[in-house]
Amino acid sequence: MPLVVEATDWTHGVFLGSNISSERTAAAEGTVGELRRDPFAMLPFCGYNMADYFGHWLKVGRGLRFDRAPRIFQVNWFRRGSDGRFLWPGFGDNSRVVDWIIRRVSGEVSTIDSPIGRLPLVEDLNLDGIDVPEADLEELFSIDTEAWKTEADLTEEFYDTFGAVSYTHLRAHETKAN
């Protein structure tokens, strides 16, 4: 996942949220560093089937006017380069991405459409005072098509763990990435 992506609409935002994953830490069961799915970062806290939880957010979206629905963004502070190091400096510099999101919602900056959502133009990020090599910026916003095809298959398997529930709307976004 790139450093930041804007959902194309509410349903796409629910799709993005339903597919959040993170590396396990010492505080979570399983192998430290292993990637695990944690929809909406709510899996340990949700007291009912996640499919119903996804359905709730889709229903909320149906009640929103298109022009007034909140914008949804997903961030990836922890993307690693091919050498295993973090590409983004993180910590206080994350505010630079939040600044871009605020300017995006205010209509001050535009985006590039991609198969996974709307991406910022790198020149619209405030990078004053930090040294992020051009190659790292390119990798931060690159989309590996083959990896996304694999991810789409894993997403299908993940959704299936919640039982025989129709994810027509969410699965429509999944196929766009292929």
Outline where the language-model segments fall.
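Intrinsically disordered or highly flexible coil/loop and linker segments, enriched in small
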Residues: 104-111, 146, 161-167
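Extended, highly charged clamp/arch subdomains and adjacent linkers
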Residues: 157-159
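Intrinsic disorder at enzyme termini
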Residues: 122-145
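Domain-length cofactor-binding catalytic modules of enzymes
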Residues: 1-130
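C-terminal helical/tail subdomains of lipid-metabolizing enzymes
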Residues: 94, 139, 143-144, 154, ...
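Conserved small/polar residues in nucleotide/adenosyl-binding loops
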Residues: 168-175
